[in-house]
Amino acid sequence: MAITKMEAGIHKGQYQVRIQPVNPVTKKRIKIPVQYTGSKQEARKIEGELWAKVKGGYDYDQAASFVPDCLVDFIDHQGTLRGWSKRTRSAWNNTLGIVSEYFEGVRMERLTEDVVRSFARKFIADRHLTVGPNSVIARVLVHMRAFCHYYVGAVFLRNPVPRGAINVFFKEEEQSLKQERYTLKREEVDELVAEIKKELDFSNPLICISRLAIWVDLQTGMRPQELQALRWSNLVGDDENGYYFHINDAWNDVSKKLNGHLKKRKHGESRDTLPISFELKESLDKYHESQKQYLREKKIVNERDLIFLNLNDYQKSASGFPVCQTSLNEMLKRLGDKIGIDTDLKWSLYSLRHTVATKLANTPGISYPWAASVLGHTVSVFMKTYVHVNEEIDGKMRNTIGKNGLF
């Protein structure tokens, strides 16, 4: 009987509700917890709800599983199915460590929005962390939302981790602003290029690698990974129409290999960068000759045709590795110190990308779709992520308004 009135025991006088459906695939009986209620009418209602869940695809076995165990299965399955990179899998494993600590003994069926909210706030309090769009808790909640979405319909009626969970779980006054990146002023760009040119010595290609890479980035705004993957064959154009890079690849510093595609682009997709100056083109030509001579002397073959091959390490250059991002960032900071850049803002190769994007956005008559295209972005992402107020334009606008205000 699905509904039985108990005649003895602690549930005496109550109605027991039990259903025993069979899994159509495995032919095994599905274990569903027995429930008790005080009236037969309520018992029939519960019975109907239980059968409705079964027919709707509710997975009782999964619902009774512990959250960390399900996350392990999810990571293994999705990582294999989607071919996650080492970096992606490492990020998910970090989330797994946190979930295992805070959701130990919690079953999937008990995972609600309130439970997730309590976890998020306790995690921040325990570790004295800040809350923001790039914070640890933001990443963990994004991962948890993706994980829970996988079980919507089978365990959850709706995702217990809401979209934009940071803004749902924390008030604005509890959040920290995203740390801005430093963007160079025009005179600082000129000073940085002047310092690079002063230090270049084409008789010693080892000195030129990082400095030329920074100069190229200052003129093109490429991502560091794209800069590392640059081949000599990517440099195209002519004296009449100018020179630029036609790129289609990016380097992965973690896996130590080329991705075979640009960021978030299909294999085979390519794009043209911003034009480079004739002075930079001539410097690259001189460096190319110096690089070839050095490789001949060391009996190294540049099989990947990399422009910024790591010549400072024989084993890495022989293996076809480009200069690493750490070396490029260290060189940029050293050059920045020389020209007097002192800032608490983020200051790295990506600052050059932000600088280029900001300059593009404030160039009169510029086409935003074109500007976004040469940087490898959609217009919306270009505007939201990389466009900053240009200090020169800001000063002009304030002078235009004048000291007496707008009215």
Residue ranges and their predicted role:
Residues 11, 18, 230-286:
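Conserved tyrosine-mediated DNA breakage-rejoining catalytic core shared by Y-recombinases
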Residues 235-242, 365-385:
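Short, polar N-cap/turn motifs at the start of nucleic acid-interacting alpha helices
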Residues 183, 251, 375-399:
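Catalytic-site neighborhood detector that most strongly recognizes the C-terminal catalytic loop/helix
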Residues 138, 164-224, 228, 240-241:
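Basic, Lys/Arg- and aromatic-enriched nucleic-acid-binding interface segment
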Residues 259-286, 303-334:
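C-terminal catalytic core of Y-nucleophile DNA break-rejoin enzymes
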Residues 198-204, 293-303, 314-322, 326-373:
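Short, basic (Lys/Arg/His-rich) helix/loop patches that form interaction surfaces
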Residues 11-16, 21-114, 118, 292-293, ...:
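N-terminal DNA-binding module of tyrosine recombinases/phage integrases
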